[in-house]
């Protein structure tokens, strides 16, 4: 992983389900997996995968068959390239949920996973500041209780790619969605996140303020950030959080 950087989010549902971008008040979350497949002298090749999670009970819009992500230069926020990713087998799958604490009623809580991959690798030239990837959509799940306006808040799924000239460097793989990815009321939960790093680097996790979407998608399902990291606006917490 080295200095690969991701933004993570933990948000609480009314039924104390923890989630991991348009779907109309349906998005639960997502992540990027970036794999360097070839490190060249002036550029490198990457395979980019996006995983999306949606509320399959309350969500109105289905998983899109394709998404277009943007890749931008850090420091300039200039678009380097866009990339179309395709939904595997053109269909999502339902995430199995449940443990000894709580087994959700699938008629009430049901999460769909969509996995998106490109048809070809993405080539990025050496650039000293590196790049960031963004996919955005709206809106979040209306049952989220710790955000002030979740059904109008979008999401930016985000990752940073260091300068390709630094050598072999891939992102972590978050593995399967945890079956017990929720907290029960007045209870604690401890689980091992099934994350691995192909480069053997150490992994550190942090809870961060969730990223909203940018000011309108101008590059497919993406838009350039502004200013310094984290480049995109954050969501406003509800009172008390």
Features from the language model and the residues they span:
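Long, compositionally biased, intrinsically disordered segments
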Residues: 22-241
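Bacterial Sec-dependent N-terminal signal peptides
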Residues: 1-28
């Amino acid at each position: 992983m080295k200095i690969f950087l991701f933004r993570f989010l933990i948000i609480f549902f009314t039924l104390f389900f923890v989630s991991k971008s348009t779907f109309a008040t349906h998005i639960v979350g997502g992540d990027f997996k970036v794999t360097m497949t070839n490190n060249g002298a002036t550029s490198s090749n990457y395979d980019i995968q996006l995983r999306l999670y949606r509320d399959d009970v309350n969500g109105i819009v289905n998983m899109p068959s394709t998404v277009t992500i943007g890749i931008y230069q850090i420091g300039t926020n200039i678009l380097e390239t866009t990339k179309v990713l395709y939904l595997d087998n053109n269909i999502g799958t339902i995430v199995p949920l449940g443990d000894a604490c709580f087994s959700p009623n699938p008629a009430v809580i049901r999460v769909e996973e969509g996995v998106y991959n490109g048809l070809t690798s993405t080539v990025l030239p050496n650039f000293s500041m590196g790049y960031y990837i963004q996919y955005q959509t709206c809106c979040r799940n209306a049952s989220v209780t710790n955000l002030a306006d979740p059904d109008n808040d979008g999401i930016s799924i985000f990752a940073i790619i260091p300068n390709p000239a630094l050598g072999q460097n891939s992102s972590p793989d978050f593995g399967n969605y945890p079956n017990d990815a929720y907290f029960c009321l007045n209870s604690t939960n401890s689980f091992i996140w099934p994350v691995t790093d192909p480069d053997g680097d150490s992994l550190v996790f942090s809870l961060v303020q969730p990223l909203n979407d940018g000011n309108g998608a101008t590059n497919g399902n993406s838009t350039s950030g502004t200013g310094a990291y984290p480049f995109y606006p954050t969501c406003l917490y509800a009172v008390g959080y």
